[in-house]
Amino acid sequence: MHRVYCADILLKSESPMNDFASMFEKATGHKRPHDYQSRLACGERQDKPEAEWFCGGTDCASRLISVPTGMGKTAAVTLAWLWNRVALGNGKWPRRLVYCLPMRTLVEQTRDEIQGWLQKLAEAYPDNEDLQRLAAHSPIILMGGVENDDLRREWDVYPEKPAILIGTQDMLLSRALNRGYGMSRARWPMHFALLNNDCLWVMDEVQLMGAGVGTAAQLEAFRNEFKTFPSCLSGLPSTTWYLSATANLDRLKTREWRNKERHATFIFELSADEKKTAVVCAKKTLDLRPNKKMEDCVGEIIQRHDALAAGKPLCSSLVICNTVKRAVALYNAIVNELTDKENKPQVLLLHSRFRRYERREQRNNLGKPIPPAGRIIVATQVIEAGVDISNAILWTEVA
C-alpha cells in the first residue's frame, strides 16, 4: 500500500493561539520573549503596534543566527517553527523540524527542553490536533544507542504529520546522504527522502561540527538546485538555520555557494538596541592568578563559595579544568576538604569519560534543585559547549 500525501500551502489551525508572546510564556514560563526571538517568529516589527506584531508570522528562509550564549536560541528556533507551522497553520513552513547537534549531551538537553515545552503547550491548547500529536510523538531522537518508544519509533510511516527530530550530526547527516548509520539499508531511501524534503534543518553549535557544517551547506545547495518538496510547488528554497554564538560566514562558502550570494537577511543577529541590554552588557569581574595551580586554590574555592552562599543562597560555582586527570584530582581534594564540614555544598564532577548510566545520573543531579549550601561543579571543557548551567562564580585554567 502506498501512502500518498500533499501539503496545502495554507493550513487551518483548529485552536488558534492568541499571540506569540502568550504561547512563549505558556511554553517557557518567561513573561516576555527577547526581541530577537519575536523577530525570528513574527518578522520585523517596523511600525506595527506590539499586539499586531505578536499576532503575525513571517517567511521561512535560511539564516545564520548569531546570538550570544545563554539568550535562548533553542527556544527561539523551536517556538518560531511551532508558532508559524502549528499555531498559524502556515503551510509554507516545513512540516518537520530537524535539530542537528554535535554532542550527545546537547541532544539529551535539547530533548528535555523541547519535550517540556510541547507538554505545556498541549495542556494549554487541548484543541490543537497537531500540537497534541507533537506532544505525544515528538521529539524523535536519532542518536547511537538510543531507542525511541512505540509512539516515536514509526515516525517515518506518517510523512504527512508534523514532527520534531533531534539527533547527532553523524546520524542525521548520514541519513540525508542516503547512508543512514545504525539502520537497515532497505530503509535508507525512506529517511533520505524524508530528511531532504519538507524539513527545516537547524544546525546548532556549528563551531563544534567540523565537516558537518560544510556537508549541511552543500546539501542545502543541492536541495535548492534539484527542487525538493515543497519548494518544487511553492518556489521557495530549501531552508537551513545555522546557529552559533561565534558565527563564521566563511565556513558556509562551500563549492556550491562560492559564486552565489545569500539573501540580504541571511545573517540574523541582535539589533543595536538589544546589544545594549543588561543581559548582553552584564559586568563581569575578572581576576587573574598567574603562576598558581588550581590544586592550590581548593581552600579559596570553598571560601569564596561559602561567602557567596551566605548572602545569596542556592548559588552555584563552576570550576573548569583542562584535563580529566586534573578535574578528578581537584574534585577529590574539594571533597576531602569538606569532609568535616557540617553545612557543606553539593560537589559534582563532570567529564567525558563517564559511562552512560553515570552520565544520566549526573545530568539528573544537575537538574535537581540546588541545596541550601549551594553547589560546586568541577568539570572539563565538556561543560563549555551549549550546556545550560547558570553559575555565580567561574574558575578556569587558562593554560
Model-found features: residue ranges?
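N-terminal helicase ATP-binding lobe
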Residues: M1-A399
